[in-house]
């Protein structure tokens, strides 16, 4: 069971919080609780029905994100003097139980990030470092044979980090998100792997700003080739598309008194190389980088993920 969402995806939220004090515009345009790119190689374990009755996996993530571009309609277009840097360390614990639900095995996971945010915007800067928002989920895994596993979950992200609408940098988005999730890992051949995870976010209101971010469709993907028994190389990335408009005070978001015609809907596609190494028979480490393209109403930059996974049974 690989992670299916950590609450790290704050890189836009911290930037947008700046504008509450700088020009009284929308404070959260395009923010999400997804963490695009979290999942890469082997999103799900193969043959889950063959795993021990009480199976655990400890995952430790490191994430680095940096952006120098921000073009967003609620700020009138391109924003000058932008530099957004985010670093996160995210422990996550997975559990797979012997209980059966709808023909699959029931499990769950919980993730708690620790974040450091640095934001420079409109000539001002801020930095914050603390615990971030907590994510947890029940999940069901279906064993479809030795080469295919399917999964479904309901992720919940709670606003447990630090938030101040007058600060540029925050480690919380200050709203709850519910995310139905579907994931898959498939081995088309002995040496190839394809993994996919899709979520759909239902964001609740940030009561500090009376702002509600729109619903978001998102997926992570991975395609890899196993060079040796323990080493794989591949491509990874993510796609995110906001499907409904942002609202503030229950109304269309405005800029300079005029309604924003695109609803401040965010979009991004990212792709890049990845490496996966297995060691001590069942443990693994991976590193993945992705460059963002086709960005709308979000920062545009580069994303780096590193991950260590250690499975164990009790």
For the regions a language model picked out, list residue spans one by one:
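Transmembrane beta-barrel strands of outer-membrane/channel proteins
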Residues: 34-35, 58-64, 108-114, 152-158, ...
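Cleavable N-terminal export/targeting peptides
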Residues: 1-38, 313-314
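Short loop/turn motifs that connect adjacent beta-strands in outer-membrane beta-barrel proteins
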Residues: 28, 46-55, 97-107, 121, ...
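Surface-exposed strand-loop-strand hairpins of Gram-negative outer-membrane beta-barrel proteins
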Residues: 28-36, 64-88, 122-127, 168-169
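Outer membrane beta-barrel transmembrane domains
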Residues: 67-71, 75-77, 210-314
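Residues that define the transmembrane beta-barrel architecture of outer-membrane proteins
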Residues: 54, 83-91, 128-134, 172-178, ...
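Outer-membrane pore/translocation modules
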Residues: 107-108, 113-206, 212, 258, ...
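Residues on the lipid-exposed face of transmembrane beta-strands in outer-membrane beta-barrel proteins
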Residues: 48, 60, 91-95, 136-142, ...
